[in-house]
UniProtKB/Swiss-Prot annotation:
PANTHER family: UBIQUITIN-FOLD MODIFIER 1. This is Ubiquitin-fold modifier 1. GO terms for cellular component: cytoplasm; nucleus. Belongs to the UFM1 family. It comes from the Eukaryota. SUPFAM superfamilies: Ubiquitin-like (SSF54236). Ubiquitin-like modifier protein which binds to a number of as yet unidentified target proteins.
Amino acid sequence: MSETKCGAKVTFKIVLASDANQPYKVLSVPEQAPFSAVIKFAAEEFRLNPATCAIITNDGVGINPTQTAGGVFLKYGSNLRLIPRDRVGFYY
């Protein structure tokens, strides 16, 4: 976490999990920002519909968007994956 004039910030490295090239974006946001806003911004950066995206950890654990960015950073770390919801689930 880094300290600025407007409060502490957290930095996330968000990888687009659905792309074979694994592109990523690095986002720095205020730690009190709602994580749903982080998901929305990350999806827009990858030109995806935010309403159809989710963020997961590298281990595949889904992250509840009702938390703050700081809470997510403390629980899950800075390396996260953005995945379109049409790719979430299991196929036989």
